[in-house]
């Protein structure tokens, strides 16, 4: 399976605007996150998203070793986010609210999550993979966001994460 890139080059991470329906003057991160989450896609091609879908999500880091064979694979290696400079990124992982919020606050988040959900709904995979460089922040964060906001019945297995390796 050829991986689907979440972003194609590092410049896509630097776009300075959000969805047209979001007030560009909002500076509070929580308010901005709330506005973004209100715009999460609920349909694909006019059909409701099957949030009861059962499948497995795997995450891994390509620098930590091989991943696993999946029906769909999403590449987050060039996806970058910004977090508060006072936070120690080494003490965080994709389970951390700060990491998940940084993904949600990415300027292309709505476009990317819509593409992921559309692909899952179209292909109906049994297994989905997310990988990044180390399998700790981005891939884990994306998998946890997919479980939290869309596919609550998935089983998530983090192949490189030291904490909560498998979640039902």
Regions found by a protein language model. Name each.
Residues 60, 131-133, 159:
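Short loop/turn motifs enriched for small/polar and acidic residues
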Residues 1, 19, 149-156:
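Structural alpha-beta junctions
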Residues 3-10, 14-18, 22-126:
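C-terminal accessory "lid"/substrate-recognition subdomains
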Residues 75, 129, 155-158:
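A structural signal for short, well-ordered beta-strand segments and their strand-loop junctions
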């Amino acid at each position: 399976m050829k991986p689907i890139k979440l972003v194609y080059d590092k410049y896509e991470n630097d776009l300075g605007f959000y969805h047209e329906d979001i007030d560009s003057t909002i500076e509070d991160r929580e308010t901005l996150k709330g506005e973004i989450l209100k715009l999460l896609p609920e349909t694909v091609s006019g059909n409701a998203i099957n949030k009861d879908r059962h499948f497995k999500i795997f995450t891994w880091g390509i620098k930590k070793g091989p991943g696993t064979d999946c029906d769909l694979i999403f590449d987050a290696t060039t996806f970058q986010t910004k977090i508060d400079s006072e936070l120690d990124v080494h003490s965080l992982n994709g389970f951390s609210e700060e990491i998940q919020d940084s993904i949600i606050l990415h300027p292309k988040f709505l476009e990317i999550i819509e593409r992921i959900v559309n692909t899952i709904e179209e292909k109906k995979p049994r297994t989905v993979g997310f990988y990044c460089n180390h399998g700790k922040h981005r891939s884990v964060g994306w998998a946890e966001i997919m479980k939290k906001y869309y596919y609550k019945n998935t089983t998530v297995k983090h192949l490189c994460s030291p904490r909560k390796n498998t979640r039902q």
